[in-house]
Amino acid sequence: MAEVICLGIAVLDHVFQMQELPQSPVKHFANDYRAVGGGNAATAAVAVARAGGNATFIGRLGNDPNAQILLDELTGYGVDVSHTRLIDGANSGVSAVLIDENGERMIVNHADPKLDFNPSWLQEELSMLDGRSKIAALADLRWKAGAEALLARAKMAGLPAVLDIDLNPEGFTDSVLRCATHALFSKPALTQYAGTENHQVALHVARERLECWVGFTAGSEGAFWLDGCQLRHQPGVEIKAVDTLGAGDVFHGTFALGLAEGLEIPHAMRFASVAAALKCSRFGGRDAIPSRSEIEMTL
């Protein structure tokens, strides 16, 4: 069975279902509420497990009640959380998420700066990559030092090293991005990184700077990547979107799993696109992430 090591953030999402997203600074009322686990790498790990892979989550949480909620949920989905570190005196990440009736979302996140940024403790954890096949690494950018350590180790071992590149308040650090074998941007992040809204030009800029495979996700428009000098496109799967929260994380997780299984890029992109679309087609947080059989039936 293929495996993906996912490193990055896990947060507790407080999700409010609303008719429309707020436009004014007054009191607003939600139609529904739920608290669910979120975070790029953590949700990607759940997607890997749901799609039939072995999933490991590596991250940092505060030593607080929210951490136990998050770890229990991940464990319930079959994710190995034994390599996650709890930090005394720090708070686990939390987000307020507003979702409108079209599935579009607004997110306010808090990440405690007291979470330990030193990745030295990872060296023993990352030995699981050595001498392995059918395994890939996936990291988000919310813990850059950890992402650099994981991706560099995977790349050195000749394994797929996938970086989830989303909008980042701290900007981008090329020394981290260059550790990836596969740099997968969100559409806004690619524009921010390359300084142009011409996405074909932006991909060429990114590839020249990073010297690796580059692509980006664009929601319902699908996903795009460079194949030599050619721009390739995986169209979005037509669905009625009701909840887009975590769709990009599902895409990244299942894309990394596809690479770990040895799929060629077009097939891995199709696999990930179907998984992300199915997730958007239903409400329910991580329970809405599709199983392997559901993905294959749609494929």
Model regions and ranges:
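Ribokinase/PfkB-type carbohydrate-kinase core domain
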Residues: 1-10, 73-86, 98-232
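Glycine-rich phosphate/adenosyl-contacting loop at the front of the ribokinase-like
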Residues: 1-60, 65-69, 76
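Conserved phosphate-binding/catalytic region of the ribokinase-like
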Residues: 1-4, 199-299
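Residues at secondary-structure transition points
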Residues: 28-39, 43, 65, 87-91, ...
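Hydrophobic packing within well-folded, soluble alpha/beta domains
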Residues: 48, 57, 74, 96, ...
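Gly/Ala-rich phosphate-binding loop of Rossmann-like dinucleotide-binding domains
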Residues: 49, 155, 260
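Short, basic and Ser/Thr-rich N-terminal targeting/leader segments
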Residues: 51, 90-93, 219
